[in-house]
C-alpha cells in the first residue's frame, strides 16, 4: 500500500490549514503517520486518493451507525436539499425529530436542537447553573465534553493525545469554577462537593474519550444520589453513547435518569446536529420563555434534521440492530484479545453495544490514570500495521471504535487475521 497522493495532499493542506487538518486528532501525530486523504465512503469502507480501501472502524467518530452513504438516508437528504438548505425558521420536521428523541429516553420532557456536541454541553451547563443558582461544576478526569473553555480541564481525547491535560488560552477565572473528580470514584466526588458551591455535574456515562471506559453501575447510581443530596443538576453527556450503545443510550445499562442529557453524532447521521434536553422545569428557563440565552443561525437545519429523522426511523424499524452490532463488537474484541495473547502481548478489550475499545495494558482500565498507563508506542505500531493492511482504526489509543450495520462476521474475521499478522510482524521487528 502506498500513500503518495495523501502525503502530497497533506503537505499542501499544511500550507493553508493549521496543521493540515480541521480537528487535531486527524493529523495522525500520535501514531507517527500520514493521514490518508479520503475520496469517498460506502458502507463499511473508506476509499482514499491513492485508490486504497479500508474497513472503517472510525465511522466519522461515531455518527454513521448505518455506515457511509446509506441509500435510504442519502435519498431523504437529497429530497430535503431540493426544498432548501436552511430557512432560519421553524419547520415541522424539527418537532417530529424532537418527539422521536424524547420517546426513547426516560426523564426527557423537552429538547433544544443545536449544531454540535460542544454547543449542547456548553448550553446544558449554562442552563444547569441558572437552575441551581450555583457556579461550580464537577467534571471527571478523561471525560471530554467539547472544547468550551470551562470544560477543557483534564479533558481526555484530543488533549491527551497531544500530551496536554488542558488547553492554553483558558482563563483561570473559567477553570476555577471547574472541579475535577476521578472517574468511577465516589469519594473524590464527595470531596469536590465539600470544596465548592457545586451547581451541576457532567459526565460521560460511557466514557469514549480516554478510550472506552464505562462507568460502574454502583458509581453512576451513587453519583445520582449525591447530586440529589447536594441539589446539583446531573448532566449525562451522551453525545457519543446516545443511540449508539443502545436505543436508550446508557439507560439500557444503568437505568439512571439525569436532570439534563446531551445527544449528538448518531442523531445527525454525519451532518452537524446535536441537542440537549431534560425536565420541563429546567428546560423552560431557556429563552424565549426564560432568561437563559441560547441561539444558533443553523440550529435545526433541515438537512441535518432530515438525516437524523431518517436514521432514527431506520433504527426503530430494525428490532435486532443493536443485538447484531453488539455481537460483532464482541466478536472483534474477543478475537483481538485472543490474537494478542498468543503473542504474549497484554491487551485489554471491551465494548458497550457497537462501541468498542482496547488498551495495550496489563490490567483492566477503570479510569483516566489506568488509561494513561497504556503502551501508546505499541498502539502506534499496531495502528500503522493495520492501516497498511486495509483496517482504519482510530488514530489514538484514547479514542473509541465503532461497528456499523453493513459490517459482517466475515469482515470481522478478516480483521482478526490482519491483527494476527500485525502482532507477528511487531514481535519479529519486521
Swiss-Prot record:
| Record protein name field | Glutamate-1-semialdehyde 2,1-aminomutase
UniProt lists the family membership as follows:
Belongs to the class-III pyridoxal-phosphate-dependent aminotransferase family. HemL subfamily.
What's the superkingdom here?
A: Bacteria
Predominant location of this chain? cytoplasm
**Quaternary context:** Homodimer.
**GO CC annotations on file:** cytoplasm
SUPFAM superfamilies reported for this sequence: PLP-dependent transferases
Gene Ontology biological-process annotations: protoporphyrinogen IX biosynthetic process
CDD domains, per database record: OAT_like
Name of encoding gene:
hemL
- Entry-linked PANTHER family: GLUTAMATE-1-SEMIALDEHYDE 2,1-AMINOMUTASE (PTHR43713), GLUTAMATE-1-SEMIALDEHYDE 2,1-AMINOMUTASE 1, CHLOROPLASTIC-RELATED (PTHR43713:SF3)
* Gene Ontology MF, one: glutamate-1-semialdehyde 2,1-aminomutase activity
Location in or out of the cell: Cytoplasm
Q: Which cysteines are joined by disulfide bonds?
A: none
What cofactor does its activity depend on? pyridoxal 5'-phosphate
Under the heading PROSITE patterns, the entry gives: AA_TRANSFER_CLASS_3
Per the record, the pathway is:
Porphyrin-containing compound metabolism; protoporphyrin-IX biosynthesis; 5-aminolevulinate from L-glutamyl-tRNA(Glu): step 2/2
Query: Which species does this protein come from?
Result: Helicobacter acinonychis (strain Sheeba)
Amino acid at each position: 500500500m502506498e500513500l503518495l497522493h495523501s502525503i502530497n495532499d497533506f503537505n499542501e493542506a499544511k500550507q493553508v490549514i493549521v496543521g493540515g487538518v480541521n480537528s487535531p486528532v486527524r493529523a495522525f501525530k500520535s501514531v507517527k503517520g500520514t493521514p490518508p486523504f479520503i475520496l469517498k465512503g460506502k458502507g463499511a469502507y473508506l476509499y482514499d486518493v491513492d485508490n486504497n480501501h479500508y474497513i472503517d472502524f472510525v465511522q466519522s467518530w461515531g455518527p454513521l451507525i448505518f455506515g457511509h452513504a446509506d441509500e435510504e438516508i442519502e435519498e431523504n437528504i437529497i429530497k430535503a436539499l431540493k426544498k432548501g438548505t436552511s430557512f432560519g425558521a421553524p419547520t415541522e420536521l424539527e418537532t417530529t425529530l424532537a418527539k422521536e428523541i424524547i420517546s426513547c429516553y426516560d426523564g426527557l420532557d423537552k429538547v433544544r436542537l443545536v449544531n454540535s456536541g460542544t454547543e449542547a454541553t456548553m448550553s446544558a451547563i449554562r442552563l444547569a447553573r441558572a437552575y441551581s443558582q450555583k457556579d461550580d461544576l464537577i467534571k471527571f478526569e478523561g471525560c471530554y465534553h467539547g472544547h468550551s473553555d470551562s470544560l477543557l480541564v483534564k479533558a481526555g481525547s484530543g488533549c491527551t493525545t497531544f500530551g496536554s491535560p488542558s488547553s492554553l488560552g483558558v482563563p483561570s477565572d473559567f477553570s476555577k469554577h471547574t472541579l475535577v473528580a476521578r472517574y468511577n470514584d465516589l469519594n473524590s466526588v464527595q470531596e469536590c462537593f465539600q470544596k465548592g458551591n457545586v451547581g451541576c455535574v457532567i459526565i460521560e456515562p460511557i466514557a469514549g474519550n480516554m478510550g472506552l471506559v464505562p462507568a460502574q453501575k454502583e458509581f453512576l447510581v451513587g453519583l445520582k444520589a449525591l447530586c440529589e443530596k447536594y441539589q446539583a443538576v446531573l448532566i449525562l453527556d451522551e453525545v457519543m453513547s446516545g443511540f449508539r450503545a443502545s436505543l436508550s443510550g446508557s439507560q439500557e445499562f444503568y437505568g439512571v435518569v439525569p436532570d439534563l442529557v446531551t445527544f449528538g453524532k448518531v442523531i445527525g447521521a454525519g451532518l452537524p446536529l446535536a441537542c440537549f434536553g431534560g425536565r420541563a422545569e429546567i428546560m423552560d428557563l431557556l429563552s424565549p420563555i426564560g432568561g437563559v440565552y441560547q441561539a444558533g443561525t443553523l440550529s435545526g437545519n433541515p438537512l441535518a434534521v432530515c438525516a437524523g429523522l431518517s436514521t432514527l426511523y431506520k433504527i426503530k424499524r430494525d428490532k435486532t440492530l443493536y443485538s447484531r452490532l453488539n455481537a460483532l463488537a464482541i466478536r472483534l474484541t474477543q478475537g483481538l484479545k485472543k490474537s494478542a495473547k498468543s503473542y504474549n502481548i497484554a491487551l485489554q478489550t471491551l465494548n458497550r453495544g457497537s462501541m468498542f475499545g482496547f488498551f495495550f495494558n496489563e490490567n483492566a482500565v477503570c479510569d483516566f490514570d489506568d488509561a494513561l498507563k497504556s503502551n501508546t508506542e505499541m498502539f502506534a505500531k499496531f495502528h500503522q500495521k493495520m492501516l497498511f493492511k486495509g483496517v482504519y482504526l482510530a488514530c489514538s489509543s484514547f479514542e473509541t471504535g465503532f461497528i456499523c450495520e453493513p459490517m459482517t462476521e466475515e469482515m470481522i474475521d478478516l480483521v482478526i487475521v490482519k491483527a494476527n499478522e500485525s502482532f507477528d510482524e511487531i514481535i519479529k521487528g519486521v
